Amino acid sequence: MKKSNQMVEKGSQAYYERQVSMGRSTLLVVLCLTVANLLLLLSNTNFYLLFSASVPYYLTILARGYDLAAFGAVNQTYTWAAVAVSAVVLGLFLLFWLMSKKNSNWLVPGLVLFGFDSLCLLLMCRFIFGGFADSLLDLCMHGWVIYELAVSIRAARRLRDGAYKV
């Protein structure tokens, strides 16, 4: 596919290839911003970036809070365990992004994993945060990522089936 900013005809092969590429890019941006959020959290910076996965971030926050409450921040066992679990989740996102370069079907497990992350965010908003108002922008961004991944999966399916304008 040519890398250009030219308009492509809707329904053409280039159009669907661009949609798949955008889905892959969205997955990579989520991965990078989640890593940045975890690094900001571990460096005690009071700053949060939207457009990232929620489970690794909030799991690490909960573990840090438990370490502070139980050990006075002397022992960070739970924090590092949460970072290890977060690394596994981020490793899965990276795997799905890398594998989707050759086979765009790997975007499907990426969508499922991010959908699970979004469900966890909804449940945290409802039962832990006490409402959706504080996380409304985060929920909207999660919805946009899910939409972007779903569009790219549909485009990949159309490319595979040859259902595009020639």
What do the predicted segments below correspond to?
Residues 1-166:
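Topology signature of small-to-medium multi-pass alpha-helical membrane proteins
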